[in-house]
Regions:
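Bacterial N-terminal signal peptides
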Residues: 1-7
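Acidic, metal/ion-coordinating pockets
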Residues: 11-390
């Protein structure tokens, strides 16, 4: 490694300024039976107050220690949380209880992407209310705002002396209520796509203006040492990214993105290391898959006969990032460790007691060694994810 640095960056040995760990999770889909699971696990005290965030803590308790020990934990918030209900919940129109946000906070999440196709499911009012509820729980929602300036604003987290910046963007919406730059807004990459658009059921697709996006990235990178971009993109249920995105991602990395976190397909796609022309190291995750949902319920709790059910496979993407300073004052980035932690959404496929929750493969196997065949089958289904940990 040092020899490579000297080749790229000169002859002086770089000085380590700091290192940190980010853990990233994929799509949170609070379907009806996810809510039912939480209600059945809710613990209420004598005053009628929930003691475990409406039961949502139970859903996340196995992965919480991983998130809590990270310096920064990220997830895609794929549902508004507005108690006032501006649209009925039906089909692909979502709304989650605010207790769900409490559970995300308790589990250890810090940064939530709210730039996705469900941002306006509860209209503009629901978007604004969700932002407030997130802030009330000492987390930050990125990619959506009370104005377009707020939606596009970089969120900066300080880790020791390192400035870590976050941006979030989506190239599709189910409902678009972006009406003016000074009203509620979701960060979009360009105008509405009019022809040769990527099909994804009923979503509205947006053209990616590469020049404008790269300009935004360059502006953001000048303010931080490490830049993390959340991008809601792709086609649902495809395990291979479109060529559109495999061509775009390296360009975005070259212009300043250090970690690119993709989501929307609801299944895993490749996670790859990337090295910029100046020697900086980075990571591209084309899709983090689902963090949890009610998808794929028909396969039972622990299927051993199929690699299907990929909407229930996911990862906690653990990335160690180190920032060095050179003799000339420049800062350089390495990825000393990339460890995707495999997870599985348990689902009893029962209307009365669905028991939906996120579980690490290692926990499933520890609790019952006879589930080894199941774990091996799931790892086979995600074999294209490089460097899977236990």
């Amino acid at each position: 490694m040092l020899a490579m640095w000297l080749c790229f960056w000169g002859h002086a040995e770089p000085t380590l300024l700091s290192s940190f760990q980010i853990v990233a999770a994929g799509d949170t889909l609070v379907h009806r039976r996810v809510k039912k699971t939480a209600r059945t696990k809710n613990i209420i005290n004598e005053n009628g107050v929930t003691q475990n965030n409406g039961g949502f803590d139970w859903i996340l308790e196995d992965v919480a220690p991983i998130l809590q020990q990270a310096d920064i934990a990220f997830v895609n918030l794929e549902s508004p949380t507005d108690p006032d209900f501006h649209r009925p919940i039906r089909g692909e129109v979502f709304n989650a209880p605010v207790d769900f946000l409490g559970a995300l906070s308790t589990a250890g999440f810090d940064v939530l992407s709210f730039a996705n196709n469900h941002s306006y499911d509860q209209k503009s009012e629901g978007l604004v209310r969700t932002l407030a509820e997130v802030e009330n729980r000492e987390m930050t929602a990125i990619g959506a705002g009370r104005s377009c300036a707020e939606a596009k604003k970089i969120h900066i987290v300080k880790v020791d002396a390192i400035r870590v910046g976050f941006l979030a963007i989506t190239d599709l919406l189910n409902i678009n209520e972006n009406t003016d730059v000074d009203t509620p807004c979701v960060y979009l990459p360009g105008p509405k796509c009019q022809k040769n658009c990527t099909p994804d059921r009923d979503a509205i697709w947006y053209h990616i203006d590469e020049n404008a996006l790269i300009s935004d990235i360059q502006t953001a990178k000048r303010q931080v040492d490490v830049l993390i971009l959340s991008f809601h993109w792709g086609i649902e249920y495809r395990t291979k990214p479109l060529s559109l995105y495999t061509a775009l991602a390296p360009k975005l990395m070259e212009h300043g993105v250090d970690v690119l976190l993709g989501h929307h397909p609801h299944v895993l796609q490749p996670v790859v290391r990337h090295t910029r022309s100046n020697g900086d190291e980075g990571v591209i995750a084309y899709s983090l898959g689902n963090f949890f949902s009610d998808m794929g319920k028909k396969y039972g709790m622990y299927p051993t006969s199929t690699t299907r059910g990929k909407t229930r496979d996911g990862i906690l993407l653990s990335i160690d990032i180190a920032v060095y300073q050179l003799e000339n004052g420049q800062r350089k980035i390495t990825i000393p460790k990339l460890a995707p932690i495999p997870i599985w959404t348990e689902n009893a496929n029962s209307n009365d007691n669905p028991q939906i929750r996120v579980r690490r493969h290692s926990t499933i196997l520890k609790e019952d060694p006879s589930r080894k065949a199941f774990v091996e089958k799931r790892r086979q289904a995600m074999s294209f994810i490089e460097g899977l940990s236990d």
